[in-house]
Amino acid sequence: MITGKTKIIGIFGDPIEHTLSPLIHNEAFSYLGLDYCYVAFNVKKDKLKEAVEAIRALNIRGVNITVPHKETVIQYIDELSDEVKNIGAVNTILNNEGILKGFNTDVNGFILSLKDEGISMKNKNFLILGAGGAAKAIVYGILKEGGKVYIYNRTPSNALAIKEKFKKFGFIEIVEMDKSVTEKIDVIVNATSLGLKKDDPMPLNPELIKPEHVYCDIVYPETPLMREAERIGCKVVGGIGMLLWQAAFAFKIWTEVEAPIEIMKKTLNKLLTKD
């Protein structure tokens, strides 16, 4: 039951209608008897500053930040965690009496989503598609775990910026897309939002994917490229695992309580079965 004391948590993004975050967080709040409510807000790029100001004005406890705001939101935040300083992208904000602090739980969310599937990162070659906020967190996580990173992005300057930012943490190289690249790759990661919309192009030509590849996608409604990878015979890791684990870390930041992982997992499985 929502009362005058209920703490509000939100998520800012565009598009946002597909998000499962309100469902899993509200189920977790209910299970633990916490007086919180999680709500989705469709925030356009030109309204982001006003939306962040509203966190303070409305005394919202915290929010998740998703595409396309993970990088641009930084300029409106008071304090940044060490990981955000290293990555340059925020996916979680905590409001502590009007002081907004940005965190990035995508890093550990991605690492644990692969570990859950028995996939080690150490000494593996990763092809990262994209060079936005999510890609930064994923690249940082892979390098932290001892993997090697190859980045393909349609705008080379963005990929170069990531290389310069993260080369001190490990091996990172920018590539053009052809078979000679994918032949040495162990894991392909789509770190773009391509696949969310019906008319989106595929981020990679499926002909370059082989059965021995692991294919990962940060998007959690199944994308056309995920279906192609499954058809080819790849092990496929969707965005659900990353969603679960980044949510668990964010949950603790807001509530100071350990997230009920199994309840959140069951909720996600029910939602996926329903779909």
UniProtKB/Swiss-Prot annotation:
Its EC number is 1.1.1.25. Keywords: Amino-acid biosynthesis, Aromatic amino acid biosynthesis, NADP, Oxidoreductase. InterPro entries: Aminoacid_DH-like_N_sf (IPR046346), NAD(P)-bd_dom_sf (IPR036291), SDH_C (IPR041121), Shikimate_DH (IPR011342), Shikimate_DH-bd_N (IPR013708), Shikimate_DH_fam (IPR022893), Shikm_DH/Glu-tRNA_Rdtase (IPR006151). One of its GO terms (biological process) is chorismate biosynthetic process. CDD domains: NAD_bind_Shikimate_DH (cd01065). One of its GO terms (cellular component) is cytosol. It is an enzyme of class 1 (oxidoreductase). The active site is at residue 70. The keyword Acetylation does not apply. It catalyses: shikimate + NADP(+) = 3-dehydroshikimate + NADPH + H(+). GO terms for molecular function: NADP binding; shikimate 3-dehydrogenase (NADP+) activity. Pathway: Metabolic intermediate biosynthesis; chorismate biosynthesis; chorismate from D-erythrose 4-phosphate and phosphoenolpyruvate: step 4/7. The keyword NADP applies. Belongs to the shikimate dehydrogenase family. HAMAP family: Shikimate_DH_AroE. NCBIfam families: aroE, PRK00258.3-3. Homodimer. This is Shikimate dehydrogenase (NADP(+)).
